[in-house]
Amino acid sequence: MTDTRKPPRKKPQRPAKPAAPREKATLHPRNRHQGQYDFAKLIKSSPELAAFVILNPYGKESIDFANPQAVRVFNRALLKAFYGIAHWDIPADYLCPPIPGRADYLHFLADLLAEDNEGVIPRGASIKALDIGTGANCIYPLLGHSDYGWQFVGSDIDSTAIAAATTIVKANGLSKAISVRQQANRRQILLGLLDSSERFHVSLCNPPFHASLEEAQRGSQRKWRALGKADPKRKLPVLNFGGQSQELWCDGGEIGFITQLIQESALLPSQVAWFSTLVSKASNLPPIHSALKKAGALEVKVVEMGQGQKQSRFVAWTFLDKAQRAPG
């Protein structure tokens, strides 16, 4: 008997489906820096920026982010155009921060405070924020006051940074909204910094990432390579992207600094409703959680953020219940 069954159809061979490109992490919805920058508009308000504008490999206007002077002028233009900060400058070799990422931290902190305020973001001078390690750039107080009207105290151990930040604050007429003070004891973070009567709704911190100068230099070299600008002749690269030693490294590195911050926060549990810090390395989260448990934190939150291909996060913790934390 003849087999009339049709042979099984072969599945047509299709080319392998290309892997989808990783989605770029998006900025917080309230972040002012969505999409491409309008360089014509930036140059109109800050003509000095024109000298630093280049075309990137995609034919788009940009700047050379390996050039500290270009980054400084670019930041000055952004602060003027987006935040009304007319006067901003920092000493040579001090940290020049990426503004969109710094703004994101503040927006997510505002969301955190809203959770204790019936979903409404608290705004105005009644909200007090403490910026630990404000730096010469004073960036968090400037952005936070512009976006939300909060009052800020910025602290630092570096007298030059304090002087530069104070100059920025005074030049922009913000002395009633932002104050800066020096932590006199370089071995302490919070202790000895605050008056016993002071109360803050939130604290924020961008801690030193590295545990030594050599580690910081290797990190700088990786950034050079990412920009295709590594100098193979240098055994130890110059610290690029700005940053004094105390801004980039400390004994114990990021985890050492954050652990000390947690320990000191437990000694001042009612003076800050929500303590927080950026955490650059996700691998540091387990020991941070352990330190917070040991310190007796009542509630802990990890908030993931992303700018472009970069992922970042901050940890927030409190020793107070919701009723005690409510802005008022």
Swiss-Prot record:
<feature type="region of interest" description="Disordered">
    <location>
        <begin position="1"/>
        <end position="31"/>
    </location>
</feature>
<dbReference type="GO" id="GO:0070475">
    <property type="term" value="P:rRNA base methylation"/>
</dbReference>
<keyword id="KW-0963">Cytoplasm</keyword>
<dbReference type="InterPro" id="IPR029063">
    <property type="entry name" value="SAM-dependent_MTases_sf"/>
</dbReference>
<dbReference type="Pfam" id="PF05971">
    <property type="entry name" value="Methyltransf_10"/>
</dbReference>
<protein>
    <recommendedName>
        <fullName>Ribosomal RNA large subunit methyltransferase F</fullName>
        <ecNumber>2.1.1.181</ecNumber>
    </recommendedName>
</protein>
<dbReference type="GO" id="GO:0005737">
    <property type="term" value="C:cytoplasm"/>
</dbReference>
<dbReference type="InterPro" id="IPR016909">
    <property type="entry name" value="rRNA_lsu_MeTfrase_F"/>
</dbReference>
<comment type="similarity">
    <text>Belongs to the methyltransferase superfamily. METTL16/RlmF family.</text>
</comment>
<keyword id="KW-0808">Transferase</keyword>
<keyword id="KW-0698">rRNA processing</keyword>
<dbReference type="InterPro" id="IPR010286">
    <property type="entry name" value="METTL16/RlmF"/>
</dbReference>
<keyword id="KW-0489">Methyltransferase</keyword>
<comment type="function">
    <text>Specifically methylates the adenine in position 1618 of 23S rRNA.</text>
</comment>
<dbReference type="GO" id="GO:0052907">
    <property type="term" value="F:23S rRNA (adenine(1618)-N(6))-methyltransferase activity"/>
</dbReference>
<keyword id="KW-0949">S-adenosyl-L-methionine</keyword>
